[in-house]
Curated annotation (Swiss-Prot):
Cellular localization per UniProt: Plastid, Chloroplast thylakoid membrane
Organism lineage: Eukaryota, Viridiplantae, Streptophyta, Embryophyta, Tracheophyta
Family, as annotated: Belongs to the Psb28 family.
Membrane topology listed for this record: Peripheral membrane protein
Name of the protein in its database record: Photosystem II reaction center PSB28 protein, chloroplastic
InterPro entries reported in the protein's UniProt record: Psb28_c1_sf (IPR038676), PSII_Psb28_class-1 (IPR005610)
Top-level lineage group: Eukaryota
Database matches in Pfam families: Psb28
Keyword set, alphabetical order: Chloroplast, Membrane, Photosynthesis, Photosystem II, Plastid, Thylakoid, Transit peptide
PANTHER family recorded: PHOTOSYSTEM II REACTION CENTER PSB28 PROTEIN, CHLOROPLASTIC, PTHR34963
Assembly mode: Part of the photosystem II complex.
Gene: PSB28
Recorded GO CC terms: chloroplast thylakoid membrane; photosystem II oxygen evolving complex
Organism: Arabidopsis thaliana (Mouse-ear cress)
Length: 183
């Protein structure tokens, strides 16, 4: 799987005594879930490679990596952000080797659009580092009508815990959540 990252570089071109910036797009590997369908209907374009003239001297500089910011989001259906802010409960073992996050959604917006957009396939936690996925998702029903969703995410290593906490920090900053330690 590959993702697109923008790499900018400044190449000095001796043309009319000025510097001309250039940028490119580089494919690099990262952990991103594949998109099953897309509304993009573009067509491939081939551009001729620019050839510097004999009077032009190219002196490439080091490429500079540009980090693209992604708004942290929770999704039950890939591509459809959940608008309801959940109640999140965290537990962690005493030795820190594993932990669990329990997300409780009351009247999630996915119930309004799930028939039109698709089926709930899991809980996807998306931020600039990639996607964290949990498939342990259960709906609560009251009198035959969907009332809420409970999703469980299990972290089996300190590395998974740290990654989840980085996501939650970004998500809570974006949505005004606050960490309250149980007394």
């Amino acid at each position: 799987m590959a993702c697109v990252r923008s790499i900018g570089s400044l190449t000095s071109v001796n043309h009319s005594q000025r510097n001309v910036p250039r940028s490119g797009i580089v494919l690099s590997s990262c952990s991103v879930l594949p998109i099953k369908s897309s509304s993009f209907t573009g067509s491939p374009v081939s551009l001729p490679r620019a050839q510097p003239s004999s009077r032009t001297a190219l002196r490439p500089m080091k490429p500079v990596s540009i980090t693209m910011m992604v708004k942290p989001a929770l999704q039950f259906i890939q591509g459809t952000d959940e608008m309801t802010i959940p109640d999140v409960k965290l537990t962690r073992s005493r030795d820190g080797s594993n932990g669990m996050a329990l997300f409780s959604f009351d009247q999630p917006s996915v119930f309004d659009s799930s028939g039109e957009v698709g089926e709930i396939t899991g809980l996807y936690m998306i931020d600039e580092e990639g996607v964290i996925q949990s498939t342990d998702v259960n709906a609560r029903f009251v009198n035959g009508k969907p009332e809420g969703i409970v999703a469980k995410h299990i972290m089996r290593s300190p590395k998974e815990w740290d990654r989840f906490m980085r996501f939650m920090e970004r998500y809570s900053d974006q949505n005004g959540l606050q960490f309250v330690k149980k007394q």
